[in-house]
Amino acid sequence: MNFNKIFVFMALILAISLGNTEAGWLRKLGKKIERIGQHTRDASIQVLGIAQQAANVAATARG
């Protein structure tokens, strides 16, 4: 029973201390992840365009 009280108390202190700190490092991490997602999206759009052109060339070559 005492362990549960200690655990809840420590979790509360941790939540308060993390809530008061500035989220600068978390924001930077989020921006990096967002940028990776944007690059992945852009690359997949380019690949789909190239694949469509290749399919058109193959269909034209077959007649």
From Swiss-Prot:
Gene: CecB
PROSITE patterns reported in the protein's UniProt record: CECROPIN
Signal sequence interval, chain numbering: 1-22
Subcellular location per the Swiss-Prot or TrEMBL entry: Secreted
Transmembrane domains' residue ranges: none
Name this protein carries in UniProt: Cecropin-B
Pfam families for this protein: Cecropin
List of residues that carry Arginine amide: R62
Record's keyword terms, sorted: Amidation, Antibiotic, Antimicrobial, Immunity, Innate immunity, Secreted, Signal
Function: Cecropins have lytic and antibacterial activity against several Gram-positive and Gram-negative bacteria.
One of the GO biological process terms: defense response to Gram-positive bacterium
Protein family according to the UniProt entry: Belongs to the cecropin family.
Organism: Drosophila mauritiana (Fruit fly)
UniProt key word Aminoacyl-tRNA synthetase: no
One GO cellular component term noted in the UniProt record for this chain: extracellular space
